[in-house]
A protein has these predicted regions:
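Conserved N-terminal phosphate-binding loop of PLP-dependent enzymes in the Aspartate aminotransferase
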Residues: 1-233
Length: 233
């Protein structure tokens, strides 16, 4: 990303970061704040509206000025239009302000990151212990589950980036059949797991994580006994 910033500065090209997911999650300043990179424009959503409908675009003052209204009819006819269903929605704005005050504290991200690392490590330990092909990986407070695949750095620990794995596997994850079966098995254990992974938050506790890992183990053992890992799906 640093090299991309250098390239765009040399060519006079705008650098746009999509921080809809990473914004305020990787750090209070998103990925750009964590890495010390300042893009020209940034898209944000989800957290920025406190969980209510809404999104935001931020960027350099000279670029953002192209959106503003002025006391100039000719300018207002030429300005970049910015229509939106939730523009100036007071409810989303109030929720967003309250939420942003919370996530401005780096302790929020540190806690969510720690819970995600605990979950990834626990799930990988289950996979290694029972000899089930698969790995759980992710950065920050995100986790991805890839059953039916192997990576060379699976040692039952937290995996930030799996090694020896095709980029296609990282993109698509496990097969739809395995994903659906795992989801159903986890629901039977009392855990509503998002298909293929999920995201942790400041609300999750170590007890939540440990109970999820225990449910994951029971679900996988049942799937193994039913023959789900006897062949590549």
């Amino acid at each position: 990303l640093h090299r991309l910033r250098e390239l765009t500065e040399r060519t006079g090209t705008l650098l746009i970061f999509d921080e809809v997911i990473t914004g305020f999650r990787w750090s209070p300043g998103g990925v750009q704040g964590l890495l010390g990179i300042r893009p020209d424009l940034t898209t944000m959503a989800k957290i920025v509206a406190g969980g209510l409908p809404g999104g935001a675009v931020g960027g350099r003052a000279d670029i953002m000025a192209l959106l503003e209204f002025r006391d100039d009819p000719e300018w207002n006819r030429r300005r970049v239009a910015h229509p939106g269903t939730f523009n100036a929605n007071p409810l989303s704005a109030a929720a967003g302000c309250a939420c942003l005050q919370l996530v401005a504290d780096p302790a929020v991200q540190r806690h969510a990151d720690a819970m995600a690392a605990r979950l990834r490590r626990g799930m990988n330990q289950v996979l290694v212990t029972h000899g089930i092909p698969g790995f759980v990986w992710g950065e920050s407070s995100v986790f991805h589950i890839a059953l039916g695949h192997t990576c060379t750095n699976q040692r039952g620990e937290d995996i930030r980036m799996p090694e020896g794995v095709s980029p296609i596997v990282l993109k698509t994850g496990m097969s739809p059949a395995l994903a659906t079966t795992l989801y159903q098995a986890m629901v039977n254990e009392g855990v509503d797991l998002f298909h293929g992974g999920g995201l942790l938050s400041v609300a999750h506790t170590p007890d939540d994580i440990d109970r999820t890992v225990e449910a994951f183990e029971r679900a996988l053992v049942r799937m193994r006994d039913e023959g789900w890992f006897d062949q590549t799906l």
